[in-house]
From Swiss-Prot:
Active site, UniProt feature: E106, E110
UniProt keyword Signal, yes or no: yes
Species the sequence originates in: Glycine max
Matches recorded under PROSITE patterns: GH16_1, GH16_2
Protein's recorded name: Xyloglucan endotransglucosylase/hydrolase 2
Protein modification: Contains at least one intrachain disulfide bond essential for its enzymatic activity. N-glycosylated; not essential for its enzymatic activity.
InterPro entries per UniProt: Beta-glucanase/XTH (IPR044791), Beta_glucanase (IPR008264), ConA-like_dom_sf (IPR013320), GH16 (IPR000757), GH16_AS (IPR008263), XET_C (IPR010713), XTH (IPR016455)
Record's catalysed reaction(s): breaks a beta-(1->4) bond in the backbone of a xyloglucan and transfers the xyloglucanyl segment on to O-4 of the non-reducing terminal glucose residue of an acceptor, which can be a xyloglucan or an oligosaccharide of xyloglucan
Localization, UniProt: Secreted, Cell wall; Secreted, Extracellular space, Apoplast
Function of the molecule: Catalyzes xyloglucan endohydrolysis (XEH) and/or endotransglycosylation (XET). Cleaves and religates xyloglucan polymers, an essential constituent of the primary cell wall, and thereby participates in cell wall construction of growing tissues.
Residue ranges of domain GH16 in the record: 31-220
Length: 283
């Protein structure tokens, strides 16, 4: 007896679910206690609210930091941050993925503090095999100190996407055919730190940290990681993958951010690269 169409539909749904599960493993953090280690700064780094909230603080003696217990090789990382309020000049809140060693890979969000009323600068960078110098900087279109906002990294063999509140702000494409290394072989941990960088962070170091405002504190919540299978990622064509990650609306949002809020792009800095822009900038 032939199976019913309903039976067939159920079978295909089960097959589809199985395929999705085999190519993507979601890890929703139960708590910061389970997923992260406080690595430096003593009691300046704290986990509270039953493991649902984490804070880092900076004073004149020390900053603080944490790292993930787990390493990741391709995936989507989401974290909600509320940055240092008030006069945060001279401070840097760094949130990034990194491997270890002299040829490490790294994907950076760095939030450069500023005087009260002036906007934060979001500094992004990508290191491949120990080499960075791929900076793009942005103003944010909101006050990142008043509420929590979500900062995300999507990392696959085809490209890396930086997102703020699910709006893409930067796409770094795999340009290995042009001889540009791409992070794809070294698993990376999640790191974050709050530290003093008043020799460069605010107006090139002209504005120093006002220690009378210390301690400076940033807050974290709602961490989530979704791991992608490298095999399934590589099987997608570049164009197909691009369409899956950035639909027409997302591409418009990316252009909007880059037109109105980007304040530095290494791919436009001809003075910095008088012998010619890096190969990935010429695509």
């Amino acid at each position: 007896m032939a199976p019913s169409s309903a039976h067939n539909n159920g079978f295909y749904v089960l097959m589809l679910v199985g395929i999705v599960v085999s190519t993507m493993v979601a890890t929703c953090a139960g708590s910061f206690y389970q997923d992260f280690d406080l690595t430096w700064g003593g009691d300046r780094a704290k986990i509270f609210n039953g493991g649902q909230l984490l804070s880092l603080s900076l004073d004149k003696v020390s900053g603080s930091g944490f790292k993930s217990k787990k390493e990741y090789l391709f995936g989507r990382i989401d974290m909600q941050l509320k940055l240092v309020a008030g006069n945060s000049a001279g401070t840097v809140t760094a949130y990034y993925l990194s491997s270890q060693g002299p040829t490490h890979d790294e994907i950076d969000f760095e939030f450069l503090g500023n005087l009260s009323g002036d906007p934060y600068i979001l500094h992004t960078n990508i290191f491949t095999q120990g080499k960075g110098n791929r900076e793009q900087q942005f103003y944010l279109w909101f006050d990142p100190t008043r509420n929590f906002h979500t900062y995300s990294i999507i990392w696959k063999p085809q490209h890396i996407i930086f997102l703020v509140d699910n709006t893409p702000i930067r796409v770094f494409k795999n340009a290995e055919p042009l001889g540009v290394p791409f992070p794809k072989n070294q698993p990376m941990r999640i790191y974050s730190s709050l530290w003093n960088a008043d020799d460069w962070a605010t107006r090139g170091g002209l504005v120093k940290t006002d220690w009378s405002k210390a301690p400076f504190t940033a807050y974290y919540r709602n961490f989530k990681a979704i791991e992608f299978s490298s095999k399934s990622s590589i099987s997608n064509s570049g164009a197909e993958y691009e369409a899956n990650e950035l639909d027409a609306y997302s591409r418009r949002r990316l252009r909007w951010v880059q037109k109105y809020f980007m304040i530095y792009n290494y791919c436009s800095d001809l003075k910095r690269f008088p012998q010619g822009l890096p190969a990935e900038c010429k695509r």
